[in-house]
């Protein structure tokens, strides 16, 4: 008679995570002939970084970056502070110069799903992501020039256009494995001519 009650939130599994488990994993095993299921590349984390160099002059700018990153990622970002003082940039040690959020687990899957299906198609004159920005170990980093491509950001309420860097960290050993994983997840890479 003991019955476990499941909350509705515990049943919801991100769409991309389900796709990875159901079809992408088996496709990668066939393509790269893995002997062990643990060799299959998987996502570790996604880091979204927003550098705000002008925050050295105006400290209010960092609040806008934190607000935007919170809306985009769904979690409160860490404020990045200057490690060294640099006189030419009028920068002192400990001054806020940016913000970053590290996404793992279901938040990471949800963010990538929104990025690939909603945000990237909204970029003007978008021809695909460059396939050359892998770091040699299967991790991929790319930059976005403005934050308004995310539908969580209200275009009328932004104080200034801010770009961001997004790094996708995988367990892939080579760039080819990482590229195959991200392509299967729906990343629109340019076809190299």
UniProtKB/Swiss-Prot annotation:
InterPro entries: Ribosomal_uL5, Ribosomal_uL5_bac-type, Ribosomal_uL5_C, Ribosomal_uL5_dom_sf, Ribosomal_uL5_N. One of its GO terms (cellular component) is ribonucleoprotein complex. One of its GO terms (molecular function) is tRNA binding. Transmembrane segments: none annotated. The keyword Cytoplasm does not apply. Gene3D superfamilies: 3.30.1440.10. Pfam families: Ribosomal_L5, Ribosomal_L5_C. Part of the 50S ribosomal subunit; part of the 5S rRNA/L5/L18/L25 subcomplex. Contacts the 5S rRNA and the P site tRNA. Forms a bridge to the 30S subunit in the 70S ribosome. This is Large ribosomal subunit protein uL5. The gene is rplE.
């Amino acid at each position: 008679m003991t019955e476990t009650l499941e909350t509705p939130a515990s049943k919801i599994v991100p769409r991309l995570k389900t796709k990875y488990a159901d079809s992408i994993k088996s496709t990668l095993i066939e393509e790269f002939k893995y002997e062990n299921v643990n060799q299959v590349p998987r996502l570790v984390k996604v880091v979204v970084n927003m550098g705000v160099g002008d925050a050295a002059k105006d400290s209010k700018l960092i609040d806008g970056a934190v607000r935007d990153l919170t809306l985009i990622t769904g979690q409160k970002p860490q404020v990045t502070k200057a490690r060294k003082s640099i006189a030419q940039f009028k920068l002192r040690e400990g001054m806020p110069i940016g913000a970053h959020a590290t996404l793992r687990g279901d938040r990471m899957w949800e963010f990538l799903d929104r990025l690939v299906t909603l945000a990237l198609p909204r970029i003007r004159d978008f021809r695909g992501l460059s396939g050359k920005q892998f770091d040699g170990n299967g991790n991929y980093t790319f930059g976005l020039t403005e934050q308004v491509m995310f539908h969580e950001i209200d275009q009328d309420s932004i104080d200034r256009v801010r770009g961001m860097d997004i790094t996708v960290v995988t367990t892939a050993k080579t760039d080819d494995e990482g590229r195959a994983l991200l392509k299967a997840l729906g990343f629109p890479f340019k076809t190299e001519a």
